[in-house]
């Protein structure tokens, strides 16, 4: 992950059972791999492989959070010009879609982002219904990325 900060030194904390906890991706890899494969199948233009997610977490560049419904993988992105940190929710997967888990855990991740010195939360998605869900709850569209694939490239 470009411009990400190594975050393995995140302080341990006790959390209520209803909140996500930092998981051991090695121990949970079979479940996580299935979730990442489902994300990639639904979004074939994503460029990473399941093993890349595993490697980022093991290397300390991302954190794997497990929750009863599924999992989230986050990282910290640092702006190269301002040095501001953004708490980036890279992947989120649940066994049952449509449960609005992003809202259920929003306050938790806002708290964690604040604790690590981030100035914002960020998600990137190709799921159209997420726009309404997020913008109705205080999120805004920071940018729209258009891509043109070169035939020779």
Where are these regions (language model features)?
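Short glycine/proline-enriched coil/turn segments at helix->beta-strand junctions
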Residues: 66-70, 117, 140-142
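Short amphipathic alpha-helix that is part of the acyltransferase structural core
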Residues: 2-48
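Active-site/acyl-donor-binding loops of N-acyltransferases
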Residues: 2-4, 123-153
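Active-site rim helix/loop that mediates acceptor-substrate recognition in acyltransferases
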Residues: 42-63
């Amino acid at each position: 992950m470009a411009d990400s900060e190594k975050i393995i030194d995140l302080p341990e904390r006790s959390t209520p059972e209803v909140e996500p906890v930092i998981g051991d991706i090695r121990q949970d890899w079979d479940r996580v791999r299935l979730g990442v494969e489902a994300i990639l199948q639904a979004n074939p233009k994503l460029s990473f492989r399941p093993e890349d997610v595993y490697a980022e977490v093991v290397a300390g560049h991302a954190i794997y959070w497990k929750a009863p419904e599924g999992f989230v993988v986050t990282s910290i992105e640092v702006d190269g010009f301002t040095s501001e940190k953004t708490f980036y929710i890279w992947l989120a997967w649940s066994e049952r879609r449509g449960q609005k888990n992003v809202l259920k855990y929003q306050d938790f991740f806002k708290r964690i982002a604040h604790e690590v010195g981030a100035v914002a939360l960020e998600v990137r998605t190709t799921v159209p219904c997420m726009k309404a869900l997020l913008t109705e709850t205080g999120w805004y569209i920071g940018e729209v990325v258009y891509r043109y694939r070169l035939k020779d490239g």
